[in-house]
Amino acid sequence: VKKSSTELVITLEEPLPPSVKAGDAVENADFYPSVVFRNNIVRNNRARGSLFTTPEKVLVEGNLFDHSSGAAILLAGDAQGWYESGACHEVVIRRNTFINNLTSRYQFTNAIISIYPEVKQLNKQKDYYHRNVLIENNVFKTFDVPLLFAISTDNLKFVNNKIIYNNDFRGWGQKPFQFRRCANILIKNNKVQPPRTWSIEDCKLENTPADQVRIEN
């Protein structure tokens, strides 16, 4: 029963299991959207470029992300502040162009593509928050900032992308890939200018075993 724009009363047919306690979050799964975000120009945003968070399919294709202040793309999720929608289960980010994102460090500015669910106790997680994220055939024209940051993500692929570095802004001097409690990561067939090859030394790993990251140049 809807009592107001911010309050619902839910009547259950059976008692809740003992594991459900006060403070747990509930979502209406009937209203999860799928998303196709295609052929748009996202330019000069003061925060992140675009934020996507839904368990349904997400396709981000053929867009220009130009000089966003923070991350160009943010996959979020939490039940403690913003109450962004639940975990992403299938995300494809392909054939986009990213130009000099992360020109400031205001908020959620860990990388050009930032997968940032807000999880208080990662070590106590029984499963990963996000999963099945494919980043392919994109062009990054960027100064020296991290390309990809992820927390609690399983099956993450960064493949067949082109990265062209410039000196338009002062570099951060950080590793291009940063993973915090992630698994099944593939970094493959990416082209970098000026030429370089990536190794596990280009990854900052927290609570992520090195054998969960496969790099093929």
What is each model feature region?
Residues 1-217:
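Extracellular parallel beta-helix/beta-solenoid repeat domains
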